[in-house]
Amino acid sequence: MSRVAKRPILIPEGIKIELNLQSISIKGKYGYLSRIIHDAVKVECLNNKITFSIRSGFSDAWAQAGTSRALVNSMIIGVSKKFSKKLQFSGVGYRVSLTKGNIVNMSLGYSHPIVYSLPPYIEAENPSPTEIVIKGVDKQLVGQIAANLRSYRRPEPYKGKGIRYSNEVVHMKEAKKK
């Protein structure tokens, strides 16, 4: 049984929530998100609290309720604070730059530059030529775009070159000895 679903979510000031059958819409100062909740979960919004309970007839109802609570909590945090992922480019000649229209240009040691177009609801900052910060209200989308950018040149274990998350630790291997 999930204990996550038993804790109510406190709604911060400035957040508007609409419940319509099994869909929830959350509007905050940074944007708007909506999601459809699983049929096994019953959602109620009373006194600035969102509570989750189960409906009978579903074997995985508590698991779905815990997942739904975590997703709704992430939506509230996203529209009130935004999520961000920082990527670092390490290697000789590895560079990243932003152009108008949310286009990321990367130089990663290939014979051609790599151009990646960001969706309109995702923001990016370029604090230095070897760093990029991806920001947005949707936690899953921010993480997916950061993972897509990282997949072009994942950090390799011998020299550590590649694109890594700012908090990622790359385990280095020793070179083969004769």
From Swiss-Prot:
Keywords: Ribonucleoprotein, Ribosomal protein, RNA-binding, rRNA-binding. It comes from the Bacteria. The keyword Ribosomal protein applies. The keyword Ribonucleoprotein applies. One of its GO terms (molecular function) is structural constituent of ribosome. One of its GO terms (biological process) is cytoplasmic translation. InterPro entries: Ribosomal_uL6-like (IPR000702), Ribosomal_uL6-like_a/b-dom_sf (IPR036789), Ribosomal_uL6_a/b-dom (IPR020040), Ribosomal_uL6_bac-type (IPR019906), Ribosomal_uL6_CS (IPR002358). One of its GO terms (cellular component) is cytosolic large ribosomal subunit. Part of the 50S ribosomal subunit. This protein binds to the 23S rRNA, and is important in its secondary structure. It is located near the subunit interface in the base of the L7/L12 stalk, and near the tRNA binding site of the peptidyltransferase center. Belongs to the universal ribosomal protein uL6 family. This is Large ribosomal subunit protein uL6. The gene is rplF.
